[in-house]
A protein has these predicted regions:
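Hydrophobic alpha-helical transmembrane segments
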Residues: 158-208, 268, 382-386
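Interhelical loop/hinge segments that connect adjacent transmembrane helices in multipass membrane
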Residues: 1-7, 122, 183-187, 201-245, ...
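Helix-terminus/linker motif at the lipid-water interface of multi-pass membrane proteins
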Residues: 26-40, 112-115, 176-179, 242-273, ...
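C-terminal transmembrane helix end/exit motif
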Residues: 1-4, 19, 101-108, 146, ...
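Signature of the first transmembrane helix
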Residues: 6-71, 100-104, 169, 229-259, ...
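Helix-loop junctions and terminal segments of transmembrane helices
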Residues: 30, 59-75, 150, 209-210, ...
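Alpha-helical transmembrane segments of multi-pass membrane transport and lipid-handling proteins
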Residues: 19, 89-115, 174, 199, ...
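Membrane-interface junctions at transmembrane-helix termini in multi-pass inner-membrane proteins
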Residues: 4, 136-163, 173-174, 184, ...
Length: 386
């Protein structure tokens, strides 16, 4: 399959994935709010944020794993590819133990970190516990996601995501229908979803990368050090992103109240979905960039970047325009029990950054491809501090 055709297939699958994800969210969110209330619903986003804060410790190791493994595969250096693969897996297993410790502390002392009523505390604790378990499983298994990246078959990831999202939705509906509605059912469904993804990723690895074998004898601390020394700048980049948009729910919970946090969480649904579309589309270009760089085809790489920027400009602007025109009416229909005017204005504020940065997002992949993340990371973290 040619590069253009492969990219088209990957992009179509990615767009289909997000269309289905948004449809599921469109019907599932009101269902959840109706059953557990807007206050309780806000804790879902907050719990996910806490997990993302804790998972920062994994970024330095994993940010460049796909890059190093893919480049070694296309340079026919399978011994090194195996060393990177095994080193990442066993290092992630160790990091998962640290995540388990962090998660345990947060769950046990949860009411000291956030404002939560006594009635909701047991449910919120279980929600946090299951979402941390989700994160731990995802961390251990993340290296198996390299297979579809290395072979530029990201459409397989998209199909897997569609199946996993449908499975998650079914779990939530079944649990809410058969038992008394509880907040932590969301966490149970997430664990089922990540286990399904793990199984498929292992299958894809065996099918697409038969040369790659997991072995403790292939673990090399030198490989870990090399990955971390470059990936640490991705950690700073992620910290900058959190400072930019990842603390809003926590700040709202601590300084205002849980109800306001719930409203803000709902208003972030569409901006988050648009960001997801942008991120998913950007990720489609990354394997091709990495493969062309590994093969030394710099002119083709430059043409690919220019083409990607044109595509991103279109994909970014269309959903933002739709939100501006139809957003207020959409929220009035989607969440009739919540002030649609407030949701609309908060959503517009959440999309301001997307308008200016969406079209050039694909360029950020180049920093990872050439393993020169320092300059970009410094700019992002300074922006977050400002």
């Amino acid at each position: 399959m040619s590069n253009k055709k492969q990219m088209a297939v990957n992009m179509f699958a990615s767009m289909l994935t997000y269309a289905i994800s948004m449809l599921i969210s469109f019907f599932l969110s009101p269902y959840i709010v109706k059953n557990i209330g807007v206050d309780a619903n806000g804790f879902i986003g907050l719990a996910n944020n806490f997990v993302s804060y804790a998972s920062l410790i994994t970024i330095a190791l994993n940010a460049l794993a796909s890059r190093f493994i893919t480049i070694n595969i296309y340079q026919n250096n399978y011994d090194n590819a195996n060393r990177y693969f095994s080193s990442v897996f066993y290092s992630n297993t160790f990091l998962s133990l640290i995540l388990a410790l962090i998660g345990s502390v947060i769950v046990i002392f949860l009411n000291r970190f956030i404002d939560v009523s006594d009635a909701l505390l047991p449910d919120v604790r279980l929600l946090f516990a299951f979402l941390f378990l989700d994160c731990i499983i995802s961390t251990i298994s993340s290296v198996f996601g390299v297979a579809t990246f290395a072979r530029n078959k990201l459409y397989l990831n998209s199909l897997r995501t569609i199946e996993a999202n449908i499975l998650r939705m079914l779990c939530i509906v079944i649990l809410f229908s058969c038992f008394e509605p509880r907040l932590f059912y969301i966490g149970i469904a997430s664990v089922v979803q990540v286990i399904y993804c793990l199984v498929l990723n292992v299958i894809y690895t065996k099918r697409l990368l038969p040369e790659i074998k997991l072995s403790r004898h292939s673990f090399h601390f030198r490989m870990v050090k090399e990955l971390v020394s470059g990936g640490v700048w991705s950690l700073f980049n992620r910290l900058g992103q959190i400072l930019l948009d990842g603390l809003d729910l926590l700040i709202t919970n601590v300084f205002i109240n849980a109800n306001s946090m719930g409203i803000l969480s709902l208003s972030k649904t569409i901006p988050t979905a648009i960001n997801g579309i942008v991120s998913a589309t950007v990720s489609i270009f990354s394997p091709n960039y990495t493969i062309l760089y590994a093969q030394g085809k710099k002119d083709e790489l430059l043409r690919s970047i220019k083409q990607s920027m044109k595509i991103m400009g279109v994909i970014t602007n269309i959903p933002v325009i739709i939100l501006v025109i139809c957003g207020k009416e959409f929220y009035a229909l989607w969440q009739p029990t919540v002030d649609s005017d407030v949701l609309y204005k908060l959503s517009l504020l959440g999309c301001v950054c997307i308008i200016f940065s969406g079209g050039i997002n694909c360029i950020y992949n180049i920093f990872t491809v050439v393993n020169k993340l320092k300059a970009n990371s410094i700019v992002v973290i300074l922006s977050g501090l400002v």
